[in-house]
């Protein structure tokens, strides 16, 4: 059998002693029922007793103090653990705290002769620093020693409880003792390596432990001996001293108290002092708040040990230190004492504004959601730097939590107790939240080495049932229980009294019955049900995948927030659930698959500016935030590669980030508000959506079109689900073999559309004289599009163009110069929008024109033009006026003084009339466009060219070949 560490014994024994020690039970009854009326607020100057176990403070009168001392003495004699302090008041006894560094690992002898000499030297300084009262007085000295040497460190206390001194007098005595050569010689003879600096200067006023009490996770000091010194003012040179006999017959808690005035052995001796100069010490609430936290919070004890594993750079270097502070603050607001303790590990920084910086960071943590790191990161850092020590601490933490339940409930374990330990074991790996249907849903953070689907690594995987927890309870949890059995059997092997041994026998018997339950299916299901409440993280589902700059990829998480993109293939705290199976690899134009795809893009889109614009546009599909309000309409008669390209984008991004959309979403009337629309819900959270395979002459629903393209919130719902609000974030492409019909003159709709017409056709036997006919390669459709190497390469191309768009155009598609698409879009609009055709053909911008047209004149001119060139029809003037106000003429329309709309700075042309100097057509000119002539390629690497109207690409001697 092995004995657990003292720290484990400390926390477990506190629980156990309440069961088998009647004295401890009586003490708790006294504190909770009778002395509770004397409770004080933390920090109160009335306080004289502090209970470190509960953090409660008391102002006890002398009679109640004696009762408390009696109970504490009985508990001490039974070996109970206690954590009581007394506050040194205005006048109280003297305590000297010696912290020794030894030359060896052996405890110093500290025999009575040496201690007697030390008493004499201390009394000399007392006489010199205070005014002793007249008459004969007995002054008692007690020496309490640290139980053992720890790594060459030792200590002892000198208690002089009867001599009542002011704090300033104590400080004076301590100050002079620090420089006493005789005292230093005595200590040096005892093997002390630091005799000149071993006396703690702060012992004059800090709260002092009552005898038998200790600091958390430390053994109490033990009484070595006591001396009685007699001083008579009539004969000050004769100072006899002798060792106290039968010292254990007294109530030592009472006799060694610095504030007690009613001892049987020790009587108070008051020394005169300047009372006006005295200032009562403050009760150091912060000094013991960490101890209280660790007593009551097992996780805090656990984190304290984990933080101790972090190397110095984590509390010296600001970025790492701030991460630790954020992690503690985001884990629990109660962990401020841990943050302060950790920060004080670097005294230089703490003493130069460290406390103020901590205060600021702690307050910022709740506001800065972008830095939402928690204790999970602390665990990762500790495991990274000290894996073996981390493993030992983690295992010990599980043991302590389980042991507390075993000892508190006499060996009987129920579902919640097991769930609590499982939460400590797996709380960093599993999360539970409630979905929109009110059901508890499990999520598991997937790590390397466990079974998974491609792409799940380093992400939160949704679990129907946490099967790993079921297995873990039976196979791993049993090992923790075996340690409890070992711990109980160890105590049974010790020479305890009969009542204590009987307690451990009953405990072991009950615990063995509980152990077998972890192999029972129904019991484990009960544990899992209770675990749902512990693992619950509210709104966790709502936080998943909310960062638009993060994409789950096959080999981790890709961050596109910075340039270049960063692959996160290690532990992180980003709540990512969705993913694509594609692995991210940096763009490499020399990669054979990348070369193949770059050449294919060159064939599919022969115009360089259009090719670059379309790739920039498609690259925005990897970003799921708000985008520019655009939609690409791609016209092609078939066998031109547009479908291959659109499907490849969708396959690369996967179903979580991309979706093929039903064309009826664009062509049908909008459903009523109360009806579901699953097709529309396919756009929720997607970065990419595409339409294809339309019938001839499909008419687009312009109101739906604007809703889908405009950035902002929309509402819809799935079948049998509640209405949801979400943002439109998809990059959308609509492909067709026929032109869409867009029956609107609204400029707000048209300015959101871009149109491109395919020129190339892939044929079995291409005409060698036709540069727009290319040799078809069925492998692109049947093999390459499914090949992971091809998909990985294309994903790297998308990321490359995304980075290029951010660096060179500030992420704005509209800044990319593309005369081909601009002119084709203009031509397409003219074919659909007769009002726009009229404006661009008959109205010119003329800054020097003096003529001002009433809007009614423009309406008349359009009606005449329409009847002459399109078809004879009856026009409604009011409708035409509204259409003109929403057209491209909007910026030229002004209000006249009589509140009518006028057209200014323009001129309406008559038939066959030409432009005058300084005039220009409104809209994009299609004269001499590149509709039928491909731009020649720049030499070598087309993807490196940046479209710029003032810097045309360097041209090759001839048009590109397939």
Swiss-Prot record:
Q: Which UniProt keywords apply?
A: ATP-binding, DNA replication, Helicase, Hydrolase, Late protein, Nucleotide-binding
**Induction of its expression:** Expressed in the late phase of the viral replicative cycle.
Looking at its record, which EC class is this enzyme?
hydrolase
Q: What PROSITE patterns does the entry give?
A: SF3_HELICASE_1
Cross-referenced Gene3D superfamilies:
P-loop containing nucleotide triphosphate hydrolases
Q: Which GO terms describe its biological process?
A: DNA replication
Which Pfam families does the annotation name?
Answer: AEP_C962R, D5_N, PriCT_2
Its Enzyme Commission number(s) read 3.6.4.-
> Which SUPFAM superfamilies did the record assign?
P-loop containing nucleoside triphosphate hydrolases
GO molecular function terms attached to this record: ATP binding; helicase activity; hydrolase activity, acting on acid anhydrides
Superkingdom assignment: Viruses
Which part of the chain is the SF3 helicase domain? 607-775
Q: Which residues bind ATP?
A: 636-643
Annotated signal sequence is none
Membership in a protein family: Belongs to the asfivirus helicase C962R family.
**Official protein name in the record:** Putative primase C962R
Q: Which organism is it from?
A: African swine fever virus (isolate Tick/South Africa/Pretoriuskop Pr4/1996) (ASFV)
Query: Which lineage?
Result: Viruses, Varidnaviria, Bamfordvirae, Nucleocytoviricota, Pokkesviricetes
